[in-house]
Amino acid sequence: MFNWVKTAMLMAAITALFIVIGGMIGGSRGMTIALLFALGMNFFSYWFSDKMVLRMYNAQEVDENTAPQFYRMVRELATRANLPMPRVYLINEDAPNAFATGRNPEHAAVAATTGILRVLSEREMRGVMAHELAHVKHRDILISTITATMAGAISALANFAMFFGGRDENGRPANPIAGIAVALLAPIAGALIQMAISRAREFEADRGGAQISGDPQSLATALDKIHRYAAGIPFQAAEAHPATAQMMIMNPLHGGGLQNLFSTHPATEERIARLMEMARTGRFD
């Protein structure tokens, strides 16, 4: 229920932001257009954002015939978590990573790169997929996927402002300084939204995944491997769609500077330390 409230609040906040930006770009007419655009985006994000994200990554659905070991692993973990079987996807990328998407546990999907399957052992891979199923169980996936598409829309709106400027209701050029401010601040607003919803969520998914698999150490060693391998392998699809970075088990972006200020994930070292403490004590609280 709490995630439904957060999702509704996020949609309302994004709608308000769109209206403000629309007003800065085009006055009252811009506000009206922005409101209609935001309502359309809200509808689209709820029903179709998961399909959009999977298409961004050219994810291919697999089954027990095409990826038997991986598919059975997900099915076994979903059973342990008392979840419906999600759709399972593979992404042909060398960078090791994984994510979950969908609007609820009944319409969920999990995806992993071919790179992560090569890098991790079967035990470590179970830890990763248990983490992703914990996101499904906690109903994080709707707000995560909506945030990805909304943040992308904010950036698109900022680019529109930068390249096309705006007109007020009398047809005069809008304040160019306002247009520049929108173009600079909108992506930052999108990044702040992602950061606000992501950090605590990853800790909870680590804990929930450890409970599902019963093996927190496997996720800890998996995170360590992913962190080390991913640092040297660019994830082209993620770099092309940075708004989706917060969906991943590990931040796939390699940029520095301001990008580091908007990191969507807790420090890997802290995540590993918490998991190893769970393994040592046998406690998941």
Curated annotation (Swiss-Prot):
Keyword vocabulary terms for this entry: Cell inner membrane, Cell membrane, Hydrolase, Membrane, Metal-binding, Metalloprotease, Protease, Transmembrane, Transmembrane helix, Zinc
Cofactor: Zn(2+)
Principal place of residence: membrane
One GO MF term attached to the UniProt entry: zinc ion binding
One GO location term (cellular component): plasma membrane
Uppermost EC category: hydrolase
Cofactor-binding details, from the entry: Binds 1 zinc ion per subunit.
Pfam families: Peptidase_M48
Active site per UniProt: E132
Residue sites binding Zn(2+) per the record: H131, H135, E202
EC number: 3.4.24.-
Family: Belongs to the peptidase M48B family.
Annotated HAMAP family: Pept_M48_protease_HtpX (MF_00188)
Protein name: Protease HtpX homolog
